[in-house]
C-alpha cells in the first residue's frame, strides 16, 4: 500500500510541476477566464457538491465529530453562495505576476529591476472546511501557481466534488486540469509524501490545529508558510481613552472566539486598572466570558475570577475564556507579549505617540495594532482579498498571505551589449 501511495503522489507531483510551467506564463486574461469558467462549473455542479457534503456530514455524525467541527464541515446553500462570491472577489483582484519594480541604471549602463513571479507548486494541507479548497485553488491560479490540496478525511467527498467542478472549468478555459488537484485518498502516508517531494513542490501551507502544523514543520523537507498559535494580546495603557479601550477589549475577545486573531490575554496598566477592570468585567459577564487573572486582577475584581497560572499566559483558548494581567508599565507589557505571545497580532490602546512608536518597534509580531481590535488581522480587512493563511514566520511572507505572498521576485537585467571589465 505504501508503494502505491508513493507512486500516486509522485504522479500528482509530476502533473502539478508540468501544469505550473504553463500557468507561470499565462496572461491575466487567461487566468480570469479560467476562474470565470470555474465559477460557472461550480454553479452547475452545486447539487452534486451539496450532496457530497451531506455524505461527509452524515459520516461525521456517525463518527461523533464534535459540533464545532461539524459546523466547519457543513456546506449550506448560503455558504456555497459565499464561496462563489469569494471566487468573484479573486477575479477582481490585481494580478501581481509580471509586475516590474525598482528599475534603475547602474554605472555600467545596465538597467536593473525586479519582476514578480509565481512560486511554482504549492502543497496545501488543511482540516474540515471545504470552502478552503476553493479559496486556495483560486488564489493559486490567479497567482500563476499549481496547487496540490490535501483536505481533512472528514471532508473528502466534498473536496472531490469541488475539485471535479474546478477541473471542468480549467478544461473549458484551455488550461491544464492538473493545475489544481485534490489528493483523493484519506491515507496519512500521502501527507508524508507531499511534504518531502522536493523535486515537485516548492512550498507547503498547513492550516489546522497545532498538532498538525507542528508535525508538518518538523517533518517537511520543503519550506513551510505557517502559524502555530494565535495567542493575541491587547495592552490598555495608562494614557488610553477608555471610550476606545472598552469596545476594543470587548470586540477583540467576544466578536468570535474560535479564530486565530481573537484576544486571549488582556494587559492593563496598574494606574488605570481600578477604573478599567470593573467596567470591562461587567461587559464580559454579559457575554459569559470566564476570567482568569493575576493576583492584582483578583484583588480588584474579587475571588470569582480564577487564578491565572503560568500555562494560561501561553494558552490560545479559542473559547470564552480570557487571561488578565495588571502590569507596571509599557516595558513589562512588551516583555510579556514577546515572552508568551505567538508573534501573531498584538495591540496597544494609548493616546501617547511615543509609546505608540515604542510598541511598534519592540513588539515582535506579524501585525501590531494601535487603538484597534486584533480582529482586523485578516486578508480581507487588509485589502488583500482572500488569504491562504496567516504567517507568523519572518522569512518570505508575514501576516495575512494573499496573492503577493504566493509570489517571489527575480532580478532582471537589461543591457545593450555591456560586458564586465
Curated annotation (Swiss-Prot):
Top-level enzyme category: oxidoreductase
Keywords, in A-Z order: Amino-acid biosynthesis, Cytoplasm, NADP, Oxidoreductase, Proline biosynthesis
Pathways involved: Amino-acid biosynthesis; L-proline biosynthesis; L-glutamate 5-semialdehyde from L-glutamate: step 2/2
UniProt-listed Enzyme Commission number(s): 1.2.1.41
Transmembrane regions listed in the UniProt entry: none
GO MF terms held by the record: glutamate-5-semialdehyde dehydrogenase activity; NADP binding
Cellular compartment(s): Cytoplasm
BP GO annotations: L-proline biosynthetic process
GO CC entries: cytoplasm
Main location: cytoplasm
InterPro entries: Ald_DH/histidinol_DH, Ald_DH_C, Ald_DH_N, Aldehyde_DH_dom, G-glutamylP_reductase_CS, Glu-5-SA_DH, GPR_dom
Matching PANTHER family: DELTA-1-PYRROLINE-5-CARBOXYLATE SYNTHASE, GLUTAMATE SEMIALDEHYDE DEHYDROGENASE
Described function: Catalyzes the NADPH-dependent reduction of L-glutamate 5-phosphate into L-glutamate 5-semialdehyde and phosphate. The product spontaneously undergoes cyclization to form 1-pyrroline-5-carboxylate.
Family statement: Belongs to the gamma-glutamyl phosphate reductase family.
HAMAP family hit by this protein: ProA
Protein name: Gamma-glutamyl phosphate reductase
Amino acid at each position: 500500500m505504501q508503494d502505491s501511495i508513493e507512486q500516486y503522489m509522485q504522479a500528482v507531483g509530476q502533473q502539478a510541476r508540468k501544469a505550473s510551467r504553463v500557468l507561470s506564463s499565462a496572461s491575466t486574461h487567461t487566468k480570469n477566464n479560467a476562474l470565470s469558467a470555474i465559477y460557472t462549473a461550480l454553479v452547475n455542479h452545486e447539487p452534486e457538491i451539496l450532496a457530497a457534503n451531506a455524505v461527509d456530514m452524515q459520516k461525521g455524525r456517525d463518527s461523533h465529530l464534535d459540533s464545532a467541527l461539524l459546523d466547519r464541515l457543513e456546506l449550506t446553500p448560503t455558504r456555497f453562495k459565499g464561496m462563489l462570491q469569494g471566487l468573484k472577489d479573486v477575479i477582481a483582484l490585481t494580478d501581481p505576476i509580471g509586475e516590474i519594480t525598482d528599475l534603475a541604471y547602474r554605472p555600467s549602463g545596465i538597467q536593473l529591476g525586479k519582476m514578480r513571479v509565481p512560486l511554482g507548486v504549492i502543497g496545501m494541507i488543511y482540516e474540515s472546511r471545504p470552502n478552503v479548497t476553493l479559496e486556495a485553488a483560486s488564489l493559486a491560479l490567479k497567482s500563476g501557481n499549481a496547487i496540490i490540496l490535501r483536505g481533512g478525511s472528514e471532508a473528502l467527498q466534498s473536496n472531490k466534488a469541488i475539485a471535479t467542478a474546478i477541473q471542468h472549468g480549467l478544461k473549458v478555459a484551455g488550461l491544464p486540469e492538473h493545475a489544481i488537484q485534490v489528493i483523493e485518498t484519506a491515507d496519512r502516508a500521502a501527507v508524508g509524501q507531499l511534504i518531502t517531494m522536493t523535486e515537485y513542490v516548492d512550498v507547503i501551507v498547513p492550516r489546522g490545529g497545532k498538532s498538525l502544523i507542528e508535525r508538518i514543520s518538523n517533518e517537511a523537507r520543503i519550506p513551510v508558510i505557517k502559524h502555530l498559535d494565535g495567542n493575541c494580546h491587547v495592552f490598555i495603557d495608562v494614557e488610553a481613552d477608555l471610550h476606545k479601550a472598552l469596545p476594543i477589549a470587548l470586540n477583540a475577545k467576544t466578536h468570535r472566539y474560535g479564530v486565530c486573531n481573537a484576544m486571549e490575554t488582556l494587559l492593563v496598566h496598574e494606574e488605570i486598572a481600578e477604573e478599567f477592570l470593573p467596567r470591562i468585567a461587567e461587559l464580559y459577564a454579559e457575554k459569559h466570558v470566564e476570567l482568569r487573572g493575576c493576583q492584582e486582577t483578583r484583588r480588584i475584581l474579587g475571588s470569582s475570577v480564577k487564578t491565572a497560572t503560568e500555562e494560561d499566559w501561553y494558552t490560545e483558548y479559542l473559547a470564552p475564556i480570557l487571561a488578565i494581567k495588571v502590569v507596571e508599565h509599557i516595558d513589562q507589557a512588551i516583555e510579556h507579549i514577546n515572552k508568551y505571545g505567538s508573534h501573531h497580532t498584538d495591540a496597544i490602546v494609548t493616546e501617547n505617540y511615543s509609546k505608540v512608536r515604542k510598541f511598534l518597534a519592540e513588539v515582535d509580531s506579524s501585525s501590531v495594532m494601535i487603538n484597534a481590535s486584533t480582529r482586523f488581522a485578516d486578508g480581507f480587512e487588509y485589502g488583500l482579498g482572500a488569504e491562504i493563511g496567516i504567517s507568523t514566520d519572518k522569512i518570505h511572507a508575514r501576516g495575512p498571505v494573499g496573492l503577493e505572498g504566493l509570489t517571489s521576485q527575480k532580478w532582471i537585467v537589461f543591457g545593450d551589449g555591456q560586458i564586465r571589465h
